[in-house]
Amino acid sequence: MEDKFSNRNTSIEFLRLWFMLLIVLIHAYCHGSGLNYEYLYSLGSDWSTAHHLGLLCIGKCGVTGFMFISGYYGVSLKWNKLASMIAMLLFYVLLLTCFGGYSVSDMLKIIFHPWDEWWFVSSYMVICFLSPLLNQGISALGKRQFGITIIGLLFYEYVGKFISQDNSHDTMFLLTIYLCARYIRMYIAPPDIPTINIKTYRNR
């Protein structure tokens, strides 16, 4: 389904780049400093070390923000885009194997079971594969049904995981953010947001 809101606001594109930078910085902070996520979560229990957890939370806003923008404008299944993502994944796997101290078994795990360390790439690809089904389903649902679905997903992701103390992010988390953004774009955001067609602008 072609999104009728395909024109992009250049300010939003810069915001997307900012969210990507936050994602890179938080990974550099966690992995570059040798700290794991479980240890960073434990630092929040003491005010003297809580700022470390605060930095982690700010970085995680990059994941939510990036996926929100993707959902706001819509994701479509494009094989060339998926091929580029897979090629990028294989490139970084090769770099980590050659220079990052990863073994061959680690490399195979990343390629064939990338849901742990590389969860975002895997989850985003799943949403790309599901996008035709998602777009058709959203079109078939009314505003009320779509809203009830969003409320249920938000309850599961935030209330349910808060109760279970599960801090993980997964495909369901990205899907929830994606659908929330679609709902806001369809039913809440004003339809006359000024936009610039970036492709047309570049061809001038």
Segments from the language model and where they lie:
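Membrane-cytosol interface segments of multi-pass membrane proteins
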Residues: 1-153, 194-201
